[in-house]
């Protein structure tokens, strides 16, 4: 595999890792390269991102991990994107993530990841940007992960007065909402959206 292919793989891995980032140990294991090769690839990718005005991303090293981030010079545009009201429909991943947060709040991203079986950085960012979810403090102990809860906008969007109005789970001891409850949850969301459009 040549250097350009390795850089493409590295870029894909960093994108998929999201805010969690990747350590050089993770990169060496996944890419099957040495520690020195990983550092060289990271340096080369950093030079490409950080040294070019036509790139919108930079490579950051934070707390021993590497992650992609947007350039500070583009912050005003990103702020506008987040502030512009959007009537776009939530993706299936975002809806599933929202249901997990609604039923388990307060909950960490890692706990949501565990229930869904995949990383949920993107869906959580979308839900926060749309005002349906917010972080409410941090977990005590190592890592100090953010705790996510639903907002009053969530209640409004689903036509609920309080969280007690959420559809009840078939088995109160169940850890995950079953498919019928998830369908009911999404149906209520779609109905409220249709009413808004009328």
UniProtKB/Swiss-Prot annotation:
Chief location: cytoplasm
Gene encoding the protein: scpB
Function, as annotated: Participates in chromosomal partition during cell division. May act via the formation of a condensin-like complex containing Smc and ScpA that pull DNA away from mid-cell into both cell halves.
GO cellular component: cytoplasm
Stretches for region Disordered: 169-198
Full protein name: Segregation and condensation protein B
Pfam families according to UniProt: SMC_ScpB (PF04079)
UniProt entry keywords in alphabetical sequence: Cell cycle, Cell division, Chromosome partition, Cytoplasm
GO terms of biological process kind: cell division; chromosome separation; DNA replication
Binding partners and assembly: Homodimer. Homodimerization may be required to stabilize the binding of ScpA to the Smc head domains. Component of a cohesin-like complex composed of ScpA, ScpB and the Smc homodimer, in which ScpA and ScpB bind to the head domain of Smc. The presence of the three proteins is required for the association of the complex with DNA.
Source organism: Listeria monocytogenes serotype 4a (strain HCC23)
UniProt family annotation: Belongs to the ScpB family.
Alphabetized InterPro entries for the sequence: ScpB_csome_segregation, WH-like_DNA-bd_sf, WH_DNA-bd_sf
